[in-house]
Amino acid sequence: MPGANYRAGAGAGAGARRPRGARDREEDGGGLEPAAVARDLLRGTSNMSFEELLELQSQVGTKTYKQLVAGNSPKKQASRPPIQNACVADKHRPLEMSAKIRVPFLRQVVPISKKVARDPRFDDLSGEYNPEVFDKTYQFLNDIRAKEKELVKKQLKKHLSGEEHEKLQQLLQRMEQQEMAQQERKQQQELHLALKQERRAQAQQGHRPYFLKKSEQRQLALAEKFKELKRSKKLENFLSRKRRRNAGKDRRHLPLSKE
């Protein structure tokens, strides 16, 4: 009969899409078992088309399908013993590892925190440098330096010659240079403060404040230095040293005399 032939043909097509064992289990059990389907379908996947393979993947699941294509059954995968991670009974005992495993180049050791050096001059925790506040805070150091200078002078009187005399002389000279540099720095701070007060007064009067150039500030500082040297009667010595220094510089630029 035509109807019977059609049903037979449909049944044959369904059998080509799915193996007989899987269809029988589906009809008997009412559902698909991934392990049983995988065992039955392992032999028939090579003859299936791409659409049939996609349908099979949707029926058994992606994981089981990949194991099926790779040739590993879920039973074999489940029969493998789980790999246990290396562990130790006591945390203070060294770790036991297999001698067959190659030791990595970069071993995992206990991390040690890096010691970071802190320079208070460039650290934000110390705040911004303010010369006025610094001088007021460490003003007691000037008294200590003055006492040390007097002590060096007394020691210098005891040692009139020899190596100790040269060391004390160099120390006294370095202390005097530091004192002169400190006085010069203090004069510059006073000059900046005076200019700042003058600009503030101009702004209060309604005038536009005038900011001096660095060259003009250096000229004002040099004029104050000359006034201070003149008051202390050291201007002539300063000018003579300045002339000798300039003469030496000019002599280096002169052409050499030919014999």
Curated annotation (Swiss-Prot):
Record's subcellular location: Nucleus, Nucleolus
Annotated coiled-coil segments of the chain: 157-205
Domain of life where this protein originates: Eukaryota
Alphabetized Pfam families for the sequence: RRP36 (PF06102)
Alphabetical list of InterPro entries matching this protein: RRP36
Gene Ontology MF annotations: RNA binding
Disordered: region residues: 1-38, 233-259
Entry's Gene Ontology BP terms: maturation of SSU-rRNA from tricistronic rRNA transcript (SSU-rRNA, 5.8S rRNA, LSU-rRNA); ribosomal small subunit biogenesis; rRNA processing
Modified residues (Phosphoserine): 73
One cellular-component annotation, GO: nucleolus
Keyword set includes Nucleus: yes
Sorted UniProt keywords: Coiled coil, Nucleus, Phosphoprotein, Ribosome biogenesis, rRNA processing
Basic residues composition bias: residue spans: 240-259
Residue window of motif Nuclear localization signal: 241-244
Function: Involved in the early processing steps of the pre-rRNA in the maturation pathway leading to the 18S rRNA.
Note: Meningioma antigen.
Family: Belongs to the RRP36 family.
Protein name: Ribosomal RNA processing protein 36 homolog
Organism: Homo sapiens
Lineage: Eukaryota, Metazoa, Chordata, Craniata, Vertebrata
